[in-house]
Amino acid sequence: MKRLLLSFLFVIAFGSCAFEEGEDELCFVGDSITYLWDLEYYFPNYIVSKHAVSGAGLKQMDSWDVSDCKGRTTILLIGTNDIGYWKSTADGIEHLREEYKDRFIKSAKRIEASPLIVLSILPRNAWGEQDPAVNENIEIQNEILKRALKTEIPGSRFVDVFDMFLDSGFEIREDLFKDGLHPNDEGYEILSQKIQGGL
């Protein structure tokens, strides 16, 4: 019932820019957050391709055949499995962030999307066991990726949803997650709305 109500509100709020039948195709690339995303439900008027594996990071993504995303609008959401345990206080963290930025840009370019839409890495508290310093680092990494995408992949878009999933003190909004890592229906509704706003 809650999901039906959310869908109704989604239509009311965004009906003026609703998708048109056969308007376009979308390609989604990511980890378990994308894998669990019911894309056919949230984007019913699009032809959707999904490349997503639970536990995946950039290394795994680089081995995938994403040639069907070339020249297509592609939404990339990945990174939590790569940097989800890095704390802002860790030794050498600045070097790690720069190195990760370079790897991320290289992997994103390989998709050859047009345009590429990158969703920010979400805050997390996997199974209620993580230090909020992890989210402080994710926030900084997102800003680094945002700046790099602007210069390294012209025409790409960075959709920042980090703050929408964050509570005070770098704690996550528990009401938007199932397990501190994967969004629940309300969380996926937010992601879908933000993507629609960027199309």
Predicted regions and their residues:
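Positively charged n-region of N-terminal signal peptides that target proteins for export
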Residues: 1-4
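Repetitive helical segments and hydrophobic/amphipathic motifs
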Residues: 11-12
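Alpha-helical cap/lid subdomain in secreted, periplasmic
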Residues: 43, 47, 62-199
